Amino acid sequence: MKTNFLVLLSALLAASSAVTATLIPAKCKHEAFSQRAGSSLNAAIKSDGRKYFGTCADPGTLGNWQISNIIKAEMGQVTPENSMKWDATQPQRGTFNFGNADRLVDFATSNGKLIRGHTLVWHSQLPSWVSSITDANDLTNVIQNRIATVVGRYKGKVYAWDVVNEMFNENGSFRESVFYKLLGEDFVKIAFEAARKADPNAKLYINDYNLDDPDYPKLKSLVANVKKWRSQGVPIDGIGSQSHLQAAGHFLDASKVGGAMQALCAAASECAMTELDIAQASPDQYTKATEACLNQKNCVGITVWGVSDNTSWRKNANPLLWNSSYQKKPAYNAVLSTLNSYQA
C-alpha cells in the first residue's frame, strides 16, 4: 500500500510539473534565464554583446579574500593596478622582475578572467635610469626591449595592452616626457610597432584621463592624432578613456561623457572605459557612464578602478561600487540594472 501511494504521488508531481511548464510562456522562460545570466556585472554586460566588466587588482589586494571573492563572482576582466608598470618590472637596467605580475596573471587565467596589460610606456612610475637617458637611439632600444620582454612573456594571455599612457597635456599638446623630448611623437609608432610584433593578436590601446567632454582640447587632440597615426599605419586598435569622473555639477562629471565616448570610439576600431570611478558614486552618474559605453557598439567593456572604497586611490571620494565594508552600494544596483535593461 505504501509503495502504491508513493508511485501515485510521484505521478501526480510529474504531471503537475508538466502542466506548470506548459503554462509558462516561452517569453517568461527566456526572461527568467536572462535575469539569471545577468545576475553579475560581467554576465549582464556580456548579455549586451560586450566582452567584459572588470576591475583593477594586484597581489596585495587579491590577498584580501573579500575582494578576491567579489572579483571571482562579479568581474570578467582584471587590470594590474601597479604590478606591470615600468618601475615594478624593470627597476634596474637589465633586470626584470615579474613576481607580482605573474601572480596577477595566474589569478586571472585560473579564474577565467580577461587581462588588460597596464602600462608599457608612461612618464610616471618610471625608473630614474630611464628618465635620465639622453640618447635617442638608446631610448628606442630600451623601449623596444621592454615591450618585447613584457608583452612577449604574456603573449596569448593578455587581451589588450595600454601601450602608451597619458601622453597629452590638458591643452592638447604633447607631454614633455623623456620619450617625447628625445623621440618626438615617433615614440608612439616605436612603441605600438614593438607591441604588435611581440603579440600580434593583442589589442593595442592608447589610454588617457580627462577625456570626458567632446569639446575638451585634450580629447580633440587625442582623437585627431589617433586618426592621423592610424592613417599612417601605426597599429593602434583602441582608445581607453580612464573615466575618473567628478561628482555631478563639477567639471568633467558624467554629463557629457556620452558625447565624449562617441567621439573617442569613432576614432578607433574599439574603445573602452578603462579606470572608471566617480566621486561620491552617485547612481545617476554611474548610470550615465554605463550608458555612454553601451551606446557605442565598439565599446568592448568597462573597468572600474578598484572594488571597494577603502582600497581606492580616491578613497576620500568614496567612488566605487562597494563600500569599505564590502557591501554593494546603490551605484552597483544602478549599473547592474542599466546593463540588464539596456536595449540598443
UniProtKB/Swiss-Prot annotation:
Factors inducing expression: Induced in presence of Zea mays leaves and by xylan, and repressed by glucose. SNF1 acts as a positive regulator through the release of glucose repression.
Pfam family, one: Glyco_hydro_10
Disulfide bonds: C293-C299
Boundaries of every GH10 domain copy: 35-338
Entry GO MF terms: endo-1,4-beta-xylanase activity
GO cellular component: a single term: extracellular region
Class of enzymatic activity (EC top level): hydrolase
UniProt name for this protein: Endo-1,4-beta-xylanase UM03411
Organism: Mycosarcoma maydis (Corn smut fungus)
